[in-house]
């Protein structure tokens, strides 16, 4: 009889967990039904920006909308408050169950619309996130690029399959104009879902210049297509997007005046894969031809993002002419080996500053800065943000608030 006691306890505990899980599922479903609109923003790059822009559009259209970004600088954005709320995570870190609490808090606040950046990476988690938790009527796929290949890959085909699995049934989907457009359309047709293709040609350079931070046409065309899917007119959408605030870590150019020649710091950490980084590089070359003639490319590496480092080695560094390539952070070995094997023939030189302090990185950079662009790529996590702050302090520029404590300024 004594031997049965532990088994009984385990069985009762398991039964209790099942009961609690079922109860939570029912509560979440009941809360979800109270929302008129739910949007799931998926993709590789630009999800946080799209979430902010779509949230602003819904607010302008009169919805009581809550937006939620995820990742490094997770934030809750409210239609009725000027301050954003930092998402404080439990010790175990990011979990898709966090989304249940987001839906609950949005409903308690009186929201009738919710826009959420997809926080799941693994394909099976993405499926659960969309079809069992948020059940969004509109999915937005910003792009399909190489990243998170260890969890979603090994190729972009698998990434596209994962994103397609989050297309709703009998709803709407916004998709990019890319090699997977027809595939996404076919999945949407099977599910009885309307398709809206983002059209970058609808966004002019003149419009983008009205923002006080840098955006690509695609950032806005995705949000504009979402507005169309939601039945919100173009004029309302364009006006609303201008009121959305930048995500922490958004692309910005910082000019520093130096006695021997001005330099420009480009914070491109958020574009943490080669394709988006090359898009930014093309903007840099177009706007700053003299400073970009002999650039400094500063990459912050992470030990848990070695695949990302390999992607930069293969697809980014060889395409930047006359660059001083500086590797900082941890696990810089792939860059060091590639340089030793002559894989960066167009580079000026390579400097390995692995595990060096931000102060040491700054001291190394100082004599190289005059007349140059410093483009910061790779990862903001780890040494990235402290190095950026060290550079801005050296240039006597006001520091952006740390990404974990970003506050919104008034819209009025």
Over which residues does each language-model region extend?
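ATP-dependent carboxylate-amine ligase
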Residues: 2-30, 34, 229, 239-246, ...
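Glycine-rich phosphate-binding P-loop
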Residues: 39-54
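Hydrophobic alpha-helical packing residues
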Residues: 54-59, 188, 339-340, 391
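A short, gly/pro- and small-residue-rich
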Residues: 130-142, 161, 388-404
């Amino acid at each position: 009889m004594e031997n049965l006691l532990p088994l009984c306890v385990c069985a009762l505990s398991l039964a209790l967990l099942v009961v609690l899980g079922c109860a939570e599922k029912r509560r979440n479903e009941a809360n979800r039904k109270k929302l008129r609109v739910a949007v799931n923003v998926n993709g590789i790059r630009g999800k946080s920006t799209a979430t902010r822009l779509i949230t602003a559009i819904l607010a302008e259209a009169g919805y009581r909308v809550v937006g939620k970004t995820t990742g490094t600088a997770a934030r809750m954005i409210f239609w009725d408050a000027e301050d954003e709320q930092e998402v404080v995570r439990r010790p175990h870190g990011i979990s898709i169950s966090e989304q249940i609490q987001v839906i609950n808090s949005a409903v308690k606040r009186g929201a009738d619309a919710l826009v959420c950046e997809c926080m799941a990476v693994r394909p099976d988690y993405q499926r659960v996130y969309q079809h069992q938790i948020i059940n969004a009527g509109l999915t937005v796929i910003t792009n399909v690029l190489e990243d998170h290949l260890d969890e979603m890959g090994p190729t972009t085909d698998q990434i596209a399959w994962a994103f397609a699995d989050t297309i709703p049934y009998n709803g709407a989907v916004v998709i990019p104009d890319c090699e997977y457009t027809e595939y996404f359309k076919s999945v949407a047709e099977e599910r009885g879902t309307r398709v809206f293709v983002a059209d970058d040609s609808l966004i002019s350079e003149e419009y983008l210049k009205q923002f006080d931070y840098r955006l690509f046409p695609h950032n806005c065309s995705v949000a504009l297509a979402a507005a169309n899917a939601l039945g919100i007119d173009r004029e309302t959408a364009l006006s609303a997007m201008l009121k959305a605030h930048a995500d922490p870590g958004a692309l910005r150019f910082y000019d520093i005046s130096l006695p021997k020649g001005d330099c420009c710091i480009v914070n491109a950490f958020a574009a943490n894969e080669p394709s988006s980084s090359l898009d930014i590089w093309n903007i840099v070359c177009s706007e700053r031809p003299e400073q970009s003639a002999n650039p400094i490319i500063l990459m912050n590496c992470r030990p848990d993002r070695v695949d990302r480092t390999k992607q930069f080695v293969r697809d980014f560094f060889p395409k930047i002419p006359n660059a001083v390539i500086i590797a900082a952070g941890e696990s810089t070995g792939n860059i060091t080996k590639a340089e030793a094997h002559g894989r960066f023939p167009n580079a000026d030189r390579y400097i390995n500053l692995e595990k060096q302090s931000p102060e040491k990185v700054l001291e190394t950079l100082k004599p190289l800065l005059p007349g140059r662009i410093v483009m910061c790529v790779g990862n903001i996590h780890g040494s990235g943000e402290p190095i950026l702050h060290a550079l801005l302090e050296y240039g006597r520029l006001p520091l952006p608030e740390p990404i974990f404590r970003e506050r919104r300024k008034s819209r009025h």
